Amino acid sequence: MDTSVMAPTRRNLLLHIAGWALTASDAVAAVRPEPSDRPLAGAIRWDAWYMPGSEPTAAVERSLSPPQYQSRLPFFARRDAEDHVSLPALSPKLMDLEIEQAAYAGLDFWAFVGYPADSPMTVALRQYLASSMRLQIRFCMFTQIETWGTSRAPAPLIDEHIALMKDEAYIRVADGRPLYFLGFITAAKANEKWGGTSGLRAAIERFRACAVAANAGNPYIVLAGSPKEIAGLAPMLGGDAVGAYVISDVRGIGDYPELVRIAEAGWQTLADADMPVVPTVMTGWDRRPRVEHPVPWERQQRPGSGIEYYFGAPRPEELSAHLRRALAWIQSQPADRRAPATLIYAWNENDEGGWLVPTVPCDTRRLEALHATLARGQQGQQPNCTVAP
């Protein structure tokens, strides 16, 4: 990574956070969420797409360059006369357009994957926070447990996220609590980083107490991991609900209905925690681009190894039916185990096979399928893919 870029971007984000802390009202913790007759619906944002020349952007350009995968490219990707793929820098107008697209779909929030402030993976979050349109779709954070640091050295990112919770666009559940995902939790990581589950529980309790003391509110914390493992760990960790970033089978093969069967069985496994479950809705799972061209952060992947394991893509009506079942499943739970939201994998995990963002040249069918479920009867301009000048 280019360290000459990192320092100013971290400084800028910290200045933004300081500004929010100074201008936030003391009553921010009591902000009422917008009323709804259904659980909230959000989508994960994994933003490797927006910083040309960075390691993550170069990696996804490479993974989606083969002709058989180019149909997955997000709508803003460029292809030259020789079919070379490039991804442009994120502009304010491009972010505004994505906000409009997500709002049309009826999404309530994006769950930004949390990274240190100097990472190129935070470019989209910074651009979103600078947008005057951001209240059209709110946001929260989905944080990997690794980025929280350790018991001896908690990461600065923890305080940064508490400050973000005070932004007026941060999503809050029905009782006004800011929604927060802490993910990829395993017993091994708890032992390595936090001295065991008791140490991680103490860190979660400190996070909660610091958020309350900062007047950000009492976070509604969703503990996420593989369904079977997190269902066993979560009751010991002091969260409010359980969930998963993705629910699939790394050695699975089949059509989209088979992936849906696995995902929905995963909801039931998560329910073994005897806690509310935020069900994950899968838009797909097909990692073949990364199998053919491994990305730097997946060091164990060998080119071609496991190429046969993938699931077919959904038809729009199959995707919307899966989402409707997730919303109905939440409502079917006992009142004390009814989660406030469902989480969609994903807005833009295109090279892993999970996306909602329009793809080249302007395929908006997945957004239209969501609109029919989440925003039925609401007026809205059809999504387009033209970035304003």
Task: List the model feature ranges, each with a label.
Residues A7, A24-S36:
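C-terminal segment of N-terminal export signals and the immediately downstream linker at the start
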Residues M1-T3, R11, S25, E349:
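Intrinsic-disorder/low-complexity regions
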Residues L22-S25, T359:
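Alpha-helical transmembrane segments and their juxtamembrane interfaces
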Residues V31-P389:
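Glycan-processing catalytic domains of CAZymes
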Residues T3-W20:
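N-terminal secretory signal peptides and thylakoid transit peptides that target proteins
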Residues H16-I17, S25, P67, F76:
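Low-complexity, intrinsically disordered/propeptide-like segments
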